[in-house]
């Protein structure tokens, strides 16, 4: 594994990892982690796709893992989108796929919709933060909007419990004892990405990148109806599947093997379909 740094536009250092070197790789996969976690929680995910012919990269988002920045804070949505863009510029663009989970899925879908990159072959959205199960109350939301203008970097406990992540006890124990996970979220991060999720749903029909959406049927953090609505609003480019007996992290739960194989088959289908079209030209 090779590690390197990428500098953000506000001079933070982001920790990037290249998981393998593969000659004649099928494609490149970049993993974007969720809130309060870090890229090394995806070691098994990276190894699976590396063992199946993909060159795999990942990075710790600002304020997470080994990257710099206040824990759980961002100056704004577009900083995260710019961070992702800078990371992608350092990667091979041969059959480039992006894989974003939860908060990382929110970053990814907004990157695709707002930046409109023309070099992405496909995207995988895992439990993408589009709608929250526990919506903020009107008064709480109003107070947060007011406070974020005064103290945007103020952080508080995100109240995320590992019990809601997975049915697998070992996954929960490792999360709770991981020194690189944290439970912080700033007012700015919450408001920007809460609104960005709503915006993405309204603009779902504008997505023009082949996308696979995955969600656990028993997710108590991010509402599966957001995934279903987004997919139904863009049947041309989006496919989705709901995994039963699965909580917030499909890649870490009872259907893990099914999730891996289903996603791999989809990636390979996109590659082979594009190759067939190229041969016909």
In which residue ranges do the predicted regions lie?
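N-terminal cap/lid segment of alpha/beta-hydrolase-fold proteins
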Residues: 1-23
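Catalytic nucleophile-loop/oxyanion-hole region of alpha/beta-hydrolase
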Residues: 36-38, 65-91, 95
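Short alpha-helix in the alpha/beta-hydrolase fold that links the catalytic acid
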Residues: 209, 223-232
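Catalytic active-site module of serine/aspartate enzymes centered on a nucleophile-bearing elbow/loop
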Residues: 237-281
């Amino acid at each position: 594994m090779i590690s390197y740094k990428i500098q953000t536009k506000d001079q933070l250092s982001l920790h990037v990892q290249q998981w393998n070197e593969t000659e004649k790789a099928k494609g490149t996969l970049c993993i974007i982690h969720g809130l309060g976690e870090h890229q090394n929680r995806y070691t098994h995910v990276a190894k699976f796709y590396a063992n199946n012919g993909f060159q795999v990269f990942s990075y710790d988002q600002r304020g997470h893992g080994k990257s710099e920045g206040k824990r759980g804070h961002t100056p704004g949505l577009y900083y995260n989108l710019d961070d992702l863009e800078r990371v992608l510029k350092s990667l091979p663009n041969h059959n480039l796929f992006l894989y974003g989970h939860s908060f990382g899925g929110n970053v990814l879908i907004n990157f695709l919709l707002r930046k409109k990159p023309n070099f992405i072959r496909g995207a995988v959205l895992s439990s993408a933060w589009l709608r929250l199960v526990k919506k903020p109350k009107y008064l709480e939301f109003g107070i947060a909007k007011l406070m974020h203008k005064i103290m945007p970097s103020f952080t508080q406990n995100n109240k995320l419990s590992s019990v809601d992540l997975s049915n697998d006890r070992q996954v929960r124990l490792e999360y709770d004892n991981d020194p690189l996970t944290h439970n912080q979220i700033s007012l700015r991060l919450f408001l920007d990405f809460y609104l960005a999720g709503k915006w993405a749903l309204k603009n779902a029909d504008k997505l023009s990148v082949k996308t696979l959406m995955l969600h656990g049927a028993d997710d108590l953090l991010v509402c599966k109806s957001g995934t279903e609505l987004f997919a139904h609003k863009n049947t041309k480019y989006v496919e989705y599947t709901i995994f039963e007996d699965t909580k917030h992290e499909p890649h870490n739960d009872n259907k893990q093997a099914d999730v891996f194989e289903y996603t791999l088959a989809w990636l390979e289908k996109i590659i082979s379909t594009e190759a067939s079209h190229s041969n016909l030209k």
